[in-house]
Amino acid sequence: MPRSVNHVASRARRKKILGLTKGYFGARKNVWTVAKNTWEKGLTYAYRDRKNKKRNFRALWIQRINAAARLEGMSYSKLMGALHKAGIEINRKVLADLAMNHPEAFKAIVAKAKAA
């Protein structure tokens, strides 16, 4: 009995990957093995960078809060300690947004933290 090969599924699978690598440079877009490896590596980078994104944004928020806090005569760590002591539960993302876009509101929060 001859060997059974599902050419339709194989071709569809390869076409799918080559479609996903459309727009890549050189052999990465049209040579099956190179395209497959590039696509898989891209998935790895995407997974890694979804984790790094959280780290990077937290660091950015801390830098922004620190810069704004120093304008008010406090360091970041002193401000966060004072906020905790004052019972002000506000996350770093919102605090950084206030520091950048609403400095008067940030000043009010810092004043309340200093008073506590």
UniProtKB/Swiss-Prot annotation:
Pfam family, one: Ribosomal_L20
Statement: the UniProt record of this protein carries the keyword Metal-binding: no
CDD domains in the cross-refs: Ribosomal_L20
Origin: domain of life: Bacteria
Keywords: Ribonucleoprotein, Ribosomal protein, RNA-binding, rRNA-binding
A GO-annotated cellular component: ribosome
Swiss-Prot/TrEMBL GO biological process terms: ribosomal large subunit assembly; translation
Function summary: Binds directly to 23S ribosomal RNA and is necessary for the in vitro assembly process of the 50S ribosomal subunit. It is not involved in the protein synthesizing functions of that subunit.
Similarity comment: family membership: Belongs to the bacterial ribosomal protein bL20 family.
Name of the protein in its database record: Large ribosomal subunit protein bL20
Source taxonomy: Bacteria, Pseudomonadati, Bacteroidota, Bacteroidia, Bacteroidales
Annotated gene: rplT
